Amino acid sequence: MDPVQSHGSQSSLPPPFHARDFQLHLQQQQQEFFLHHHQQQRNQTDGDQQGGSGGNRQIKMDREETSDNIDNIANNSGSEGKDIDIHGGSGEGGGGSGGDHQMTRRPRGRPAGSKNKPKPPIIITRDSANALRTHVMEIGDGCDLVESVATFARRRQRGVCVMSGTGNVTNVTIRQPGSHPSPGSVVSLHGRFEILSLSGSFLPPPAPPTATGLSVYLAGGQGQVVGGSVVGPLLCAGPVVVMAASFSNAAYERLPLEEDEMQTPVHGGGGGGSLESPPMMGQQLQHQQQAMSGHQGLPPNLLGSVQLQQQHDQSYWSTGRPPY
């Protein structure tokens, strides 16, 4: 007969050893020991009523230490029991999960990259239609100053306002102001002259020719000063620097204003004024639209939308101006 079988038939094998049951049994024994010790100390302190203040203080300290030990054991047993349950569950359910389970704690604080990123600055790449651009124009030796600025205005399709200029010019033809009956005399100056003052404006076509003009004041070599409106070429004797500003919009206003346009609505604050009636305001708006639709009106935009007829100075104004 097999000795193993004979031994198994006589007595059963002992149950397997579990670390969990051993730890729980050890913790229970420790708790019972400390509870028994605490009960004995409490009975001794209740029976001893003749102790001094020092004895009472020592007894109180012993009580506090005992209660702290009991609380620590209870906390440790609870935390260890949780750990044992967690690991035990992972071992028992390992067939279903196939690995060890680890507790993951969510990190505190904001996740990386979640801060408010700085916004890019707002950059306006297109200028306003009413903006003025400043230009420093340098005109070379022997070039016509008037023709150079007029070509710049025509190619860029922008109005140019000449504010000042420095340099020397030669062979100037100007119209000097005359008396009231005569329009003035045209004078041709030969030689080299220094620019004292230079001003004027240039508008691209089809703007009226009267809107374009240039005035200059010159100083001669002997101290004489002459000036007037330039009616011919203005040749540069060396480099000439012109300070100018360009614009794309221009509101054309014809002065003096008509009587309907001069009437402005009165704000009724004291009770004596009266506002214009709606029919009168409608007639005024219609009159302004008719004036702008004619050949004498210059629309605000100069970029090819101007439709004006080239006229001479005598026939430009449809009606004569009233004397000032």
From Swiss-Prot:
CDD domains: DUF296
Region (Disordered): 1-122, 262-324
SUPFAM superfamilies: AF0104/ALDC/Ptd012-like
Biased composition (Low complexity): 24-33, 280-297
Gene of this entry: AHL24
Bias (Polar residues) ranges: 1-12, 69-79, 304-318
GO molecular function annotation: minor groove of adenine-thymine-rich DNA binding
PANTHER family attached to this UniProt entry: AT-HOOK MOTIF NUCLEAR-LOCALIZED PROTEIN 15, AT-HOOK MOTIF NUCLEAR-LOCALIZED PROTEIN 24-RELATED
UniProt protein name: AT-hook motif nuclear-localized protein 24
GO cellular component, as recorded: nucleus
Domain of life: Eukaryota
Organism classification: Eukaryota, Viridiplantae, Streptophyta, Embryophyta, Tracheophyta
Record-annotated PPC domain positions: 129-268
Entry annotated with the keyword Nucleus: yes
Organism annotation: Arabidopsis thaliana (Mouse-ear cress)
Compositional bias per record (Gly residues), positions renumbered to this chain: 88-99
Function: Transcription factor that specifically binds AT-rich DNA sequences related to the nuclear matrix attachment regions (MARs).
Annotation: DNA-binding region: 105-117
Domain notes: The PPC domain mediates interactions between AHL proteins.
Places the protein is found: Nucleus
Keywords: DNA-binding, Nucleus, Transcription, Transcription regulation
